[in-house]
Amino acid sequence: MPKLEMMLLVLLILPLSYFSAAGGQVVQGDLRSDVLARYLQRGDRDARECQVNTPGSRWGKCCLNRMCGPMCCPESHCYCVYHRRRGHGCSC
């Protein structure tokens, strides 16, 4: 595969690692905080509503809804519960 085609392929696939369609989660790195802020400020999203998991680490996860353990709840009215033997989960 020629170099230009490979570069275009990488540029097309790269954004998929930052936005997950299942739950609206955003994965951020230290150098991409401005991209995250712009994403959150579009429409009705606000950076103040972003809850970042693993603060201080190189990679973190931003939840637009409530965070429950290592995951984001799918809707804003959900709350976090603990299930015996299954761990934390969202109850909606």
Swiss-Prot record:
Propeptide span(s): 25-45
UniProt modified residues of type 4-carboxyglutamate: 49
CC terms in the record's Gene Ontology section: extracellular region; host cell postsynaptic membrane
Molecular functions per Gene Ontology: acetylcholine receptor inhibitor activity; ion channel regulator activity; toxin activity
Localization: Secreted
Signal peptide residues on this chain, from the entry's feature table: 1-24
Domain comment (free text): The cysteine framework is XX (C-CC-C-CC-C-C-C-C). Displays a mini-granulin fold, a structure composed of two short, stacked beta-hairpins connected by two parallel disulfide bonds. This newly described fold is derived from the same cysteine connectivity as knottins (ICK fold). The name 'mini-granulin fold' comes from the structural homology with the N-terminal region of the human granulin.
Role noted for this protein: Alpha-conotoxins act on postsynaptic membranes, they bind to the nicotinic acetylcholine receptors (nAChR) and thus inhibit them. Through its two C-terminal domains, this homodimeric protein would bind to two nAChR allosteric sites, located outside the nAChR C-loop of the principal binding face and at the adjacent binding interface in a clockwise direction. This toxin specifically blocks mammalian neuronal nAChR of the alpha-7/CHRNA7, alpha-3-beta-2/CHRNA3-CHRNB2 and alpha-4-beta-2/CHRNA4-CHRNB2 subtypes.
Protein name per UniProt: Alpha-conotoxin-like Rt20.1
